[in-house]
Amino acid sequence: MQVHVGLTLLLCAVLLSSATASSDDESNQDESIDSKSSLPADESVKDHSTTGRVVAGQIFVDSEDPEVESPLQEEEESSKTEEEVSVGEEISFVESPSLSSKSYEEAKRARKPVLTAIEGTAHGEPCHFPFLFLDKEYDECTSDGRQDGRLWCATTYDYKTDEKWGFCETEEDAAKRRQMQEAEMIYQAGMKILNGSNRKSQKREAYRYLQKAAGMNHTKALERVSYALLFGDYLTQNIQAAKEMFEKLTEEGSPKGQTALGFLYVSGLGVNSSQAKALVYYTFGALGGNLIAHMVLGYRYWAGIGVLQSCESVLTHYRLVANHVASDISLTGGSVVQRIRLPDEVENPGMNSGMLEEDLIQYYQFLAEKGDVQAQVGLGQLHLHGGRGVEQNHQRAFDYFNLAANAGNSHAMAFLGKMYSEGSDIVPQSNETALHYFKKAADMGNPVGQSGLGMAYLYGRGIQVNYDLALKYFQKAAEQGWVDGQLQLGSMYYNGIGVKRDYKQALKYFNLASQGGHILAFYNLAQMHASGTGVMRSCHTAVELFKNVCERGRWSERLMTAYNSYKDGDYNAAVVQYLLLAEQGYEVAQSNAAFILDQREATIVGENETYPRALLHWNRAASQGYTVARIKLGDYHFYGFGTDVDYETAFIHYRLASEQQHSAQAMFNLGYMHEKGLGIKQDIHLAKRFYDMAAEASPDAQVPVFLALCKLGVVYFLQYIREANIRDIFTQLDMDQLLGPEWDLYLMTIIALLLGTVIAYRQRQHQDVPVPRPPGPWPAPPQQEGPPEQQPPQ
């Protein structure tokens, strides 16, 4: 009977062994390993500590000491019956035919891991050698079962049973890991200081931390420091050092590094300019997900710079960026950025740039402290959104709104509701508190509070969802012209929430909200035009709207950083920042970069490259409709700055500025070119016509136009004398017909000018003081090396 039982058990063991072998063959052929026997993904080890010791393997010795057996093995062996042991020996013999069952068991017991100074996984756990995986024994770390080739080991004998494992690492890998852990700690410390303070001294200290982390090859620290060196942000500007860091980042596959290197090749900063290389790096940066690279490529396809113009390609890039910008828009609306054009500020010093003077801010603060509610609300809004020379500060905004709300101001209550609904480091998020303030403001008829209450009912924030009440409050807010109410009404009609879907109504309210400058209204309109929803599909309209949204992204804050650098006299830092923004398609950055180059204030660009680069950016700004840039293009071709003298091209640019933007300066220049016959056939009558048009277009042009007409009268008189018969001149000469009914006034003006010139000349001789030259009525040239070929008389 025992023989039959033994044979039966042996037969079962053989069958079991063959089944196991066949399953091994099938599992080897299949690419995916069974979940019970395959290694988990990398994500499964994220909870492990990363403060372990170095591992390179284990040292094994032959040992017959039974005390080194693991408790698990002792428990298993003690629980086995003699019959089970014999079956196990038979099975082991079948699985390992090269060893006898006895020798195999002895070898398995003898080979025990011995803890040494070098041990364990990257998580500080000892490797167990040998260990079983897929019914195979491994005496060292292996990459089996992993697609990425990383080495691993089991930390218990049977991986299939316990599934305890870890990655192995070499001494070098462990040193790198510890270094990166230290670098990460330093980086986080620097970022905490950088984000938690507005003081320049503390920000410089933060960058010292970041520089140290960058020296340890921390990728994010390298990106921060390299851009700081490029722009001169709290570090001394160093283009060469920035370039080296960008190259290092590019080798590591950093999209930010690739985008920045593309910018350097475009602008020729630290490298020889190469549009082809720039396009390659921009493309790689965009493929890596860098939003600035997408903006650059979108603008290049829009303007046809280095690539063929393609509306659909522009739409692809701009839509991707706009999606991110729209998703970042908070309930409070985000920060506000002023777009200040340096040429306008210089030509019109009295023009309001939108920036508040420090004295005026202090005056408002004084009024707020004295209890002026309007000053409190105004300062609260300034600090909530930032802009106009005031830094964003939620703590101050909250304090000012609290003061005004306690005084019963409904607007302050509504904005407190917004701050509580959004939540921040200063104001904890609380739907109940937000709802309280929204209700109080809405009961007082405040549109901001009504819109906030509508949002609460629409999304169920602190109250049960009620689409009818949401629609009611949005309508009340929209009737008072509040853009948030108009936007939400449009969204409800667009999506059919609480109302019947109506794209015409959605389009109506989105248009109203866009007129108030709401970013999400532009975004929704762009989506409708891009997909042809409710309107005729228009790629060009969608692109213009998406471009508007993209330019409201967080990177637009650098416009103010560049402006502040310019005001501080750091022209090199300002021009580099404007040049990068110009690559992204910002017209104001293009004109400001061209202006700085035109004034030769930036030494970072070589003298031979100054005017050609300025001409390039004037051209790009003009293509986006900036009048001054169009006139500057005419001036550059008129005087030959950065290009050859070309009167015909200059005439074309002046005419475009005259016809499209009704520029008085362009009309005056056209009159002068008609008078002199430059780039066009000489025509005194057309010259007078353009002079008159310039005087009508701008009151500031009346004086130079009057002087130009006086000169034109003399020119016409001399021309008439040359063409007329000298003997008939006195019989045919009619001064009224020749110079107009006010010819005597012209004559007196000429005499007065001559007399003034003589007096000024005599005074200069006596005082030895040069007389300042009066401004000429012709195109004002930039500073130049030598006199132009064709210079109008003073």
Swiss-Prot record:
<dbReference type="InterPro" id="IPR036943">
    <property type="entry name" value="FN_type2_sf"/>
</dbReference>
<feature type="region of interest" description="Interaction with ERLEC1, OS9 and SYVN1">
    <location>
        <begin position="22"/>
        <end position="737"/>
    </location>
</feature>
<dbReference type="InterPro" id="IPR006597">
    <property type="entry name" value="Sel1-like"/>
</dbReference>
<keyword id="KW-0597">Phosphoprotein</keyword>
<dbReference type="GO" id="GO:0005783">
    <property type="term" value="C:endoplasmic reticulum"/>
</dbReference>
<keyword id="KW-0325">Glycoprotein</keyword>
<feature type="repeat" description="Sel1-like 3">
    <location>
        <begin position="255"/>
        <end position="290"/>
    </location>
</feature>
<dbReference type="Pfam" id="PF00040">
    <property type="entry name" value="fn2"/>
</dbReference>
<dbReference type="GO" id="GO:0036503">
    <property type="term" value="P:ERAD pathway"/>
</dbReference>
<feature type="repeat" description="Sel1-like 1">
    <location>
        <begin position="183"/>
        <end position="218"/>
    </location>
</feature>
<keyword id="KW-0812">Transmembrane</keyword>
<feature type="glycosylation site" description="N-linked (GlcNAc...) asparagine">
    <location>
        <position position="431"/>
    </location>
</feature>
<dbReference type="InterPro" id="IPR013806">
    <property type="entry name" value="Kringle-like"/>
</dbReference>
<keyword id="KW-1015">Disulfide bond</keyword>
<feature type="compositionally biased region" description="Acidic residues">
    <location>
        <begin position="23"/>
        <end position="32"/>
    </location>
</feature>
<dbReference type="InterPro" id="IPR050767">
    <property type="entry name" value="Sel1_AlgK"/>
</dbReference>
<feature type="disulfide bond">
    <location>
        <begin position="127"/>
        <end position="153"/>
    </location>
</feature>
<feature type="repeat" description="Sel1-like 4">
    <location>
        <begin position="291"/>
        <end position="326"/>
    </location>
</feature>
<feature type="compositionally biased region" description="Acidic residues">
    <location>
        <begin position="62"/>
        <end position="77"/>
    </location>
</feature>
<keyword id="KW-1133">Transmembrane helix</keyword>
<keyword id="KW-0472">Membrane</keyword>
<feature type="domain" description="Fibronectin type-II">
    <location>
        <begin position="122"/>
        <end position="170"/>
    </location>
</feature>
<feature type="repeat" description="Sel1-like 9">
    <location>
        <begin position="519"/>
        <end position="554"/>
    </location>
</feature>
<dbReference type="GO" id="GO:0000839">
    <property type="term" value="C:Hrd1p ubiquitin ligase ERAD-L complex"/>
</dbReference>
<keyword id="KW-0732">Signal</keyword>
<feature type="topological domain" description="Lumenal">
    <location>
        <begin position="22"/>
        <end position="738"/>
    </location>
</feature>
<feature type="repeat" description="Sel1-like 11">
    <location>
        <begin position="664"/>
        <end position="699"/>
    </location>
</feature>
<dbReference type="GO" id="GO:0006641">
    <property type="term" value="P:triglyceride metabolic process"/>
</dbReference>
<feature type="modified residue" description="Phosphoserine">
    <location>
        <position position="63"/>
    </location>
</feature>
<dbReference type="InterPro" id="IPR011990">
    <property type="entry name" value="TPR-like_helical_dom_sf"/>
</dbReference>
<dbReference type="GO" id="GO:0009306">
    <property type="term" value="P:protein secretion"/>
</dbReference>
<feature type="glycosylation site" description="N-linked (GlcNAc...) asparagine">
    <location>
        <position position="608"/>
    </location>
</feature>
<feature type="repeat" description="Sel1-like 2">
    <location>
        <begin position="219"/>
        <end position="254"/>
    </location>
</feature>
<feature type="region of interest" description="Interaction with SYVN1">
    <location>
        <begin position="643"/>
        <end position="723"/>
    </location>
</feature>
<feature type="repeat" description="Sel1-like 8">
    <location>
        <begin position="483"/>
        <end position="518"/>
    </location>
</feature>
<feature type="glycosylation site" description="N-linked (GlcNAc...) asparagine">
    <location>
        <position position="195"/>
    </location>
</feature>
<feature type="repeat" description="Sel1-like 10">
    <location>
        <begin position="627"/>
        <end position="662"/>
    </location>
</feature>
<dbReference type="Pfam" id="PF08238">
    <property type="entry name" value="Sel1"/>
</dbReference>
<keyword id="KW-0677">Repeat</keyword>
<feature type="transmembrane region" description="Helical">
    <location>
        <begin position="739"/>
        <end position="759"/>
    </location>
</feature>
<keyword id="KW-0256">Endoplasmic reticulum</keyword>
<feature type="glycosylation site" description="N-linked (GlcNAc...) asparagine">
    <location>
        <position position="217"/>
    </location>
</feature>
